[in-house]
Amino acid sequence: MNFEFGAKRRDPYAWLEQSLATIHRADWYRSVQPINGRPGATVVLAGQEVINFASNDYLGLAGDKRLMAAATAAIAEFGTGSTGSRLLSGHRELHRELEKAIASTKQTEDALVFSSGYLANLGAITALVGKRDLILSDQYNHSSLKNGAILSGAAVVEYPHCDVAVLKTQLSQQRQNYRRCLILTDTVFSMDGDLCPLPALFDLADEFSCMLLVDEAHATGVLGKTGAGCVEYFGCTGKQLIQIGTLSKALGSLGGYVAGSSALIDFLRNRAPSWIYTTGLSPADTAAALAAIKIVQQEPQHLAQLWRNIHYLKTLLQQLPNLKLLPSESPILCFQLPNATDALKAGKQLRDAGIFAPAIRPPTVPTSRIRISVMATHKVAHIEKLVAALKDVI
C-alpha cells in the first residue's frame, strides 16, 4: 500500500470523524448522561428519577453512610491523595489493613491492592507470563483479561465460552510447547451472568501443570456463603490459584486486588508494572473499601436480601414466555434482542417507564441485549415495576 505525503499531505485526524460516522450507522454510538445525588436503587438520571437496574453496586454499599464516614475520616487524617507509588511515598498502613482484610475474606496468605481491577489484571498477567509462555482465555472474558494477555507477549489462544472439552484438547495439543501456561477466566461473566466451570478448570490446571487466574470482579461480595466469591461458592477455598477482583462493585468503593500465596504477592510487588509505576490507591477509597469488607463480614443480611431479590425477579420473569433470558447464577440477568436497533428501542421504552436498564450492544457483546443488575436495596415494588414494564416491551 502506497501512502502519499509532501505537497498532498492529508489531515492525519480526518479518519476520526469517518470512524464516528460508521459507529453511528451501526447503532453502536455511546454517550454519557449525568446521574445526580447518591447512588442507590433509585437515581436521578439527566433530570429524571428512575429505578436503577444498571448498577454494579450489588449490596447497595456505595451510598452507605458508614463508607462515607470512613472515607471522610481518612481524608482528614491522610489527605486526598497517596502522593506517589506504594514503593516510594504512596504507602500507608491503611493499605496493608485493607490487604489483610481481603486476604482474610478470600482465605489466602496475602493480597495486593491496585488502583483498579483493570490494572490488577494487566499487572498480574504481564508479570506472570511472557514470550515463551501460553495463555488460554475464555472467549467472553473481560477486556482487562484479554488486553493483559496481549500485553504479556505470550501466545494467546481463546477457547469457546466455558467449553472445558475444547480447552482440554487445546492443552493436549499445545501445552508441551511452552515454558509456562496460564488459564484465564472470569468467574461471573459480566455481560451474561453465568459462572465459569471452576472445578473442571482446576482439574485441567492440575493435569497440565498450568497456573489458573480467575477474575472475581462480579463475584466478590455476591457469591458464596460469606460473600467471598465464586471460589468459595464452588468449595475451592484454599486451592492454589490467582484471585483478582475489584473494590468498586459490591464493595462500593474503587480499586482492585490480587489475592494468593505470599510468594505470588511478593513477586507482584517487584514485577507488576501497573502496581509499581502508578500512584497508590487514595486514602478515601482504601478506607471505604475496608469499611465495606467489615460490613460484608458482620452483616450477612445484605447478601441474603440480594439473593431474595434475585430469586423473586427470576420467578416473575418466568411469566414472560417471549423473554429470551440467558442462563444466569448471579445478580446479572440479560435478555437477547435481534439487533442493536431493537435493543436501543427496548432500552428507551424502559427508560420512558421509569426503568434504567440500557441496551448493551456490539462490540461489547456478540449479540445485542438488555442487561439487568439486581441490588440488595431494590424493593419489591421496584422489581414488580420492572416486570410490568418488560411486559410492554417484549
Curated annotation (Swiss-Prot):
Single GO biological process annotation from the record: biotin biosynthetic process
UniProt enzyme class: transferase
Residues that bind pyridoxal 5'-phosphate: G117, Y118, S190, D215, E216, A217, H218, T246, L247, S248, K249
Enzyme Commission (EC) number: 2.3.1.47
Binding site for substrate: R30, H142, T364
MF annotations from Gene Ontology: 8-amino-7-oxononanoate synthase activity; pyridoxal phosphate binding
UniProt keyword list: Biotin biosynthesis, Pyridoxal phosphate, Transferase
Residues carrying N6-(pyridoxal phosphate)lysine: K249
Signal peptide per UniProt: none
Superkingdom classification of source: Bacteria
Record's keyword annotation contains Transmembrane helix: no
Pathway noted in the entry: Cofactor biosynthesis; biotin biosynthesis
Database matches in Pfam families: Aminotran_1_2 (PF00155)
Cofactor: pyridoxal 5'-phosphate
PROSITE patterns, sorted: AA_TRANSFER_CLASS_2 (PS00599)
Record InterPro entries: Aminotrans_II_pyridoxalP_BS, Aminotransferase_I/II_large, AON_synthase_class-II, AONS_Archaea/Proteobacteria, PyrdxlP-dep_Trfase, PyrdxlP-dep_Trfase_major, PyrdxlP-dep_Trfase_small
Reaction(s) the record says it catalyses: 6-carboxyhexanoyl-[ACP] + L-alanine + H(+) = (8S)-8-amino-7-oxononanoate + holo-[ACP] + CO2
The family this protein is said to belong to: Belongs to the class-II pyridoxal-phosphate-dependent aminotransferase family. BioF subfamily.
Entries under NCBIfam families matching the protein: bioF
Function field: Catalyzes the decarboxylative condensation of pimeloyl-[acyl-carrier protein] and L-alanine to produce 8-amino-7-oxononanoate (AON), [acyl-carrier protein], and carbon dioxide.
Subunit structure: Homodimer.
Protein name, per record: Putative 8-amino-7-oxononanoate synthase
Organism, as annotated: Nostoc punctiforme (strain ATCC 29133 / PCC 73102)
Upper classification of the organism: Bacteria, Bacillati, Cyanobacteriota, Cyanophyceae, Nostocales
